[in-house]
């Protein structure tokens, strides 16, 4: 056997052993239930993992704008749609995509809403790679759980049973009125969307298309995070996203109602 083949074989064996070790440790440290006491991150958003199979019509993704603006129980009461908000504070698009994939493991929503503030939250390649590594091997996301392992962690079985009564919505009691006198003043300005963010939205759109769901981009009112420049860029991006690949809908509820839904 040549030196090259020996070296290649050693590398393959090393990688195989490493993958087995990472898989085993990941099974040990990953939370066995979707509760904060079991160590899961963002338990309100991860409450969707405990919902009965195929009971969610509408999935909502985004940062704090999403879980503050959308009230799933109100959507159920007024329109009869079952919705769940997987929004988290300062959510990045790679985290939005991770929740999208987790939700579709047991659910088949026909509509996915992406709150658009998340499109402008920048992130590093390092954090993106760490998230993808954590999706593959949970030890990268839950490496600190070794300090709080319980007896049931050693059984390696995962059983998500926790559900959230508010379905991901988080009531904010400390909100104060904002000065909206110059909010959404008409402008032809455009705000740049980072290239990697565009790529993630395109991936989210492609996943929705492949799984029979429509993607709806929605801009919730925010005098701090939203303006006409971002609206204009998002509208142009949504138009391009839908060309030749089905309908990409964009609704900006910061605009007057007769202009808010642009299809």
Model-predicted segments: where are they?
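Membrane-embedded segments
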Residues: 61, 65-145
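Secreted/periplasmic serine-hydrolase-like ester/acetyl group-modifying domain
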Residues: 125-214
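Catalytic His-Asp segment of secreted/periplasmic serine-dependent ester chemistry enzymes
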Residues: 230-263
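Structural motif
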Residues: 57-58, 111, 216
């Amino acid at each position: 056997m040549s030196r090259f083949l020996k070296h290649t074989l050693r590398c393959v064996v090393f990688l195989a052993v490493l993958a087995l070790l990472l898989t085993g440790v990941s099974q040990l440290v990953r939370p066995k239930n979707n509760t904060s006491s079991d160590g899961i991150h963002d338990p309100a958003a991860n409450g969707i993992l405990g919902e009965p199979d195929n009971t969610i019509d509408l999935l909502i993704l985004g940062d704090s704008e999403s879980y503050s603006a959308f009230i799933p129980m109100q959507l159920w009461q007024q329109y009869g749609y079952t919705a769940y908000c997987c929004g988290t504070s300062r959510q990045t698009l790679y985290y939005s995509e991770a929740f999208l994939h987790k939700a579709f493991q047991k659910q088949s929503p026909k509509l996915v809403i992406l709150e658009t503030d998340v499109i402008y939250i920048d992130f590093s390649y390092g954090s993106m790679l760490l998230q993808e590594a954590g999706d593959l091997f949970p030890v990268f996301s839950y490496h600190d759980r070794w300090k709080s392992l319980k007896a049931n962690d050693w059984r390696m079985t995962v059983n998500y049973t926790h559900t959230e009564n508010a379905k991901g919505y988080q009531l904010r009691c400390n909100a104060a009125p904002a000065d909206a006198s110059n909010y959404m003043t008409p402008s032809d300005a455009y705000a740049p969307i980072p290239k990697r963010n565009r790529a993630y939205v395109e991936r989210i759109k492609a996943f929705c298309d492949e799984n029979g769901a429509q993607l709806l981009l929605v801009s919730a009112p925010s005098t701090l995070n939203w303006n006409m420049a971002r609206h204009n860029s998002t509208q142009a991006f949504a138009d391009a996203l839908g060309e030749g690949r089905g309908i990409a809908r964009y609704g900006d509820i910061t605009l007057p109602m007769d202009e808010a839904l642009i299809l």
